[in-house]
Amino acid sequence: SDVYKRQEPTILGGMKRVVDPRILGEEALFDILGFRIALEIGICSDIFRNITPEDISELEEIVKMGIVFENNEYAPVSEFTFHAKLYEITGNKTISEFQDIIHPVMIFVKNKFKDLLEPINIEMKEQGQIVTHVDLLNFLKNRDELGYRKAIEQHFEVYKRFLNSRK
């Protein structure tokens, strides 16, 4: 009977305990960042296969809240919530669990390397290359998987340029 069945440990449970961005070396931080970018691009087809009108409504609410909080300390919450919802849509619990691990790393990287990321962001903004959550949401609403795939890659371009400049 299931009553005596032990709770199965989560696949990333151990990783969650050891991934502390304050004690990780730069190479490990950059590897995690690169993994996150690859994961975001890799889950595109699952998102489009599983997304419901309710999911789109929820993402619309998240995006609205993100705009409200854009310039203060709530911005990371908006970032987390938007991408956590995308991970949830895949239906894969391990992917969702990864978001809990990667979020503190992303905040740490953004803060630690702010002076290096900012000029890349400014350059991309001047060239009209910034892809926002609003842009991503529009591709989802329009069921444009190819457009979304290109847009999510561009959404993380600032980090890709940053990582390439560190090699």
Residue positions per predicted region:
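Short linear motifs at protein or domain termini
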Residues: 1-38, 45
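Short helix-coil transition/hinge motifs at the ends and kinks of transmembrane helices
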Residues: 115-124
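Short, Lys/Arg-enriched, disordered terminal segments
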Residues: 3, 165-167
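Conserved amphipathic alpha-helical segments that form helical-bundle/coiled-coil interaction surfaces
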Residues: 32-114, 132-135, 147-159, 166
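Short helix-capping and inter-helix turn/linker motifs at the boundaries of alpha-helical repeat units
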Residues: 126-128
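Short, structured coil/loop segments at alpha-helix boundaries
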Residues: 25, 92-96, 122
